[in-house]
């Protein structure tokens, strides 16, 4: 199908412009045109005719409004140009009134929809009759996905239906219904994030992510309170599915829109505090600790003022985490211990397990194995609480801390055992961020055991995953790990460049090392400099420091053939 579409485009393009040829430069654009026009021969012919005026790249860029591009944007265009619109107009006129109404209202969906969603937007009785008619008349396509029917438009039909919806005056009502449905879906999903049904609900949100984006966009325009609620409900989904930057952007937009609106501040403050906590959590996980700390401070301030203990606990946890990464150790422990005290006084058992796990993590990063007795106490209580929890992730988080604790204590084989088990569980739960994090820990264990090839294979995966996530601090640490291996393999020049590139990235992104990372880095750097001429080292350091992140990653991934 794809090959035939491209062949048709080339034939019609040559008819329109005899100088047209398919090249390596325009081939991706031609393929994109055919894909975005859903392989419809008539649409492809009309697009190819535009090579008289535009390059394939320009045509692809203008496909955002297919009907306007392909018909010249006018109902008085030449008959040949009007063919596509005439075809869709004719199909539309064959529909009865109910089918026409349903066709228009379903244009608010992005990326398809379920029958339940269609009922919410177009009405139960109308959808029952109208949708089946649209399917029978090939205006709507239906697919089976995991035992459920999912419906979609060809994009040209969706744009036509949206035009009709806007003309009808029903667009606002349809979008409001669409928003209400996906706000409700987000609410129902969030209730199951800490249950064994977590993966099924996460997968459902993934399938509806385009619709969620559309609903959020409309909420920002018309209903800022709903936008604020949605970002709170979706924050864990964005975190586990590696939509960290996107999630941060939605949170910032929702908070800004709500704070700039005429909404009653007392009414929205509880949700606003939760939104700041969500922003802090997402920022921390993408390595933007400064933004994370700022958001966490705001959440703490609001939660204290309105006396919302549960939100305060979660905000303090975020403040503790991000402050530890920024080197503000006193604030980190003060925040986490205050959270611990509240949990014990109020009886927040699930949250107590989480703050104890946070204390284990931060204590390890700051004090390493020197605080073994305190770490053991935190771990034992956290493990006992996790075993009584209905949240499947609680046990997995504990397993992860056992792996990290074994790693810091130098028991690398034990660390690997726990990491392997935890990695499998995170994959089962669909938590992609946690998978990347623990693959990194497995790489660290392999490196420290001297299994350099295994470690390098893992680092080659994880450094690109951290880059995609946008966690510049994690990328910098991975570059350092590549450098440590290079030094161990007596590739001093390579090690110097990589360590310098990592240093430059940390400086540019305000991503300091944790105390434990600093100890290893300083030891490696001292050993490297001791075995190298100072003038040569200075030259190599300057070369590495001039690399941007993309260049440094490319250099790290390139095999040393010298």
Over which residues does each language-model region extend?
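Aliphatic-rich helical/repeat scaffold segments used for oligomerization and domain docking
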Residues: 1-257, 472-473, 479-481, 485-501, ...
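Tandem amphipathic alpha-helical repeat scaffolds
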Residues: 228-242, 271-288, 311-328, 351-371, ...
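Eukaryotic all-alpha helical interaction scaffolds
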Residues: 219, 238, 258, 283, ...
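Alpha-helical protein-protein interaction modules
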Residues: 426-562
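Tetratricopeptide repeat
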Residues: 215, 247, 251-254, 292, ...
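Acidic, proline/glycine-rich low-complexity intrinsically disordered segments
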Residues: 18, 134, 145, 154, ...
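Inter-helical turn/loop elements of alpha-helical hairpins
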Residues: 141, 163-306, 310, 321-334, ...
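Short coil/turn linkers that connect adjacent helices within long alpha-helical scaffolds
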Residues: 221-222, 261-267, 301-308, 341-348, ...
């Amino acid at each position: 199908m794809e090959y035939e579409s491209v062949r048709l485009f080339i034939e019609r393009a040559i008819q329109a412009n005899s100088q047209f040829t398919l090249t390596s430069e325009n081939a991706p654009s031609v393929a994109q045109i055919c894909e975005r026009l859903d392989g419809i021969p008539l649409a492809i012919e009309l697009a190819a005719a535009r090579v008289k005026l535009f390059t394939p790249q320009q045509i692809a860029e203008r496909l955002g409004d297919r009907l306007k591009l392909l018909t010249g944007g006018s109902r008085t265009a030449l008959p040949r140009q009007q063919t596509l619109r005439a075809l869709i107009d004719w199909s539309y006129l064959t529909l009865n009134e109910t089918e026409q109404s349903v066709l228009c209202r379903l244009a608010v969906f992005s990326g398809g929809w379920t029958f339940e969603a269609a009922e919410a937007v177009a009405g139960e009785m109308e959808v029952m009759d109208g949708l089946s008619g649209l399917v029978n008349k090939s205006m709507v396509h239906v697919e089976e996905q995991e035992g459920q029917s999912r419906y979609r438009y060809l994009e040209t039909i969706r744009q036509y239906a949206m035009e009709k919806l806007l003309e009808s005056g029903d667009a606002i009502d349809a979008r409001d219904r669409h928003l209400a449905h996906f706000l409700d879906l987000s609410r129902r999903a969030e209730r199951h994030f800490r249950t064994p049904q977590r993966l099924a609900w996460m997968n459902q949100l993934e399938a509806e992510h385009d619709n969620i984006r559309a609903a959020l966009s409309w909420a920002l325009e018309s209903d800022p309170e709903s936008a604020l609620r949605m970002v709170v409900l979706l924050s864990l989904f964005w975190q586990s599915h590696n939509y960290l930057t996107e999630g941060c952007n939605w949170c910032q937009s929702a908070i800004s829109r709500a704070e700039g609106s005429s909404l009653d501040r007392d009414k929205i403050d509880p949700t606003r505090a939760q939104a700041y906590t969500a922003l802090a959590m997402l920022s921390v996980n993408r390595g933007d600790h400064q933004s994370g700390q700022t958001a966490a401070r705001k959440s703490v301030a609001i939660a204290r003022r309105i006396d919302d203990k549960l939100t305060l606990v979660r905000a303090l946890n975020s403040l503790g985490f991000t402050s530890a990464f920024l080197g503000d150790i006193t604030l980190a422990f003060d925040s986490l211990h205050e959270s611990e005290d509240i949990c014990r006084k109020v009886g927040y058992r699930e949250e107590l397990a989480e703050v104890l796990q946070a204390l284990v993590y931060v204590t390890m990063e700051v004090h390493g194995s020197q605080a073994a007795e305190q770490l053991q106490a935190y771990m034992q209580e956290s493990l006992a609480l996790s075993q009584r929890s209905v949240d499947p992730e609680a046990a997995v988080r504990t397993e992860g801390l056992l792996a990290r604790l074994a790693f810091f204590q130098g028991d690398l084989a034990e660390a690997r055992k726990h990491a392997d088990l935890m990695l499998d569980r995170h994959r089962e739960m669909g938590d992609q961020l946690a998978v990347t994090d623990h693959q990194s820990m497995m790489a660290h264990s392999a490196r420290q055991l001297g299994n350099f090839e295994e470690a390098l294979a893992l680092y080659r995966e994880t450094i690109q995953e951290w880059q995609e996530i946008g966690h510049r601090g994690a990328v910098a640490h991975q570059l350092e790990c590549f450098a440590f291996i290079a030094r161990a393999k007596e590739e001093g020049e390579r090690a110097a460049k990589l360590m310098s590139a990592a240093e430059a990235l940390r400086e540019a992104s305000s991503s300091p090392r944790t105390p434990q990372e600093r100890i290893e880095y300083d030891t490696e750097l001292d050993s490297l400099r001791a075995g190298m001429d100072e003038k040569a080292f200075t030259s190599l350091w300057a070369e590495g420091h001039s690399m941007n992140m993309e260049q440094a990653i490319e250099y790290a991934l390139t095999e040393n053939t010298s």
